[in-house]
Amino acid sequence: MHRNDFTCFTQSVYTKKDGSVESQICCLTNRIVKLTRHFQTHRKDYSSQRGLWKILGRRKRLLIYLLQTDAIGYRDLTTQLKIRKLKKK
């Protein structure tokens, strides 16, 4: 998957308002993919790893909120973005 393919994919997946939970999750997923691609060449970039962990935590909190408010939308979004579902506690 090329760099521009993923951005177009996330923009085409969700076309509602920019501030909605789904669009925020799409943007965070896009940033996560870019950072993981960055780590393939820069393995010891620990400050960026910390930023990645913060982004992952923010996306996880948004996914929990989406699951609690709209379970069907959560399921659709996780399948469209091809991300794993949350673990049950």
Curated annotation (Swiss-Prot):
Family annotation (SUPFAM superfamilies): S15/NS1 RNA-binding domain
Any GO molecular function: structural constituent of ribosome
Subcellular location: Plastid
Gene3D superfamilies assigned to the protein according to its UniProt record, in alphabetical order: S15/NS1, RNA-binding
A single Gene Ontology CC term: ribonucleoprotein complex
Major subcellular location class: plastid
KW Ribosomal protein (keyword) present: yes
An example Gene Ontology biological process: translation
Pfam family, one: Ribosomal_S15
Keywords per UniProt: Plastid, Ribonucleoprotein, Ribosomal protein
Keyword DNA repair set for record: no
HAMAP family to which the protein is assigned, alphabetical: Ribosomal_uS15_B
The protein's assembly and partners: Part of the 30S ribosomal subunit.
Similarity field: Belongs to the universal ribosomal protein uS15 family.
Protein name: Small ribosomal subunit protein uS15c
Gene source species: Aneura mirabilis
Gene name tied to this protein: rps15
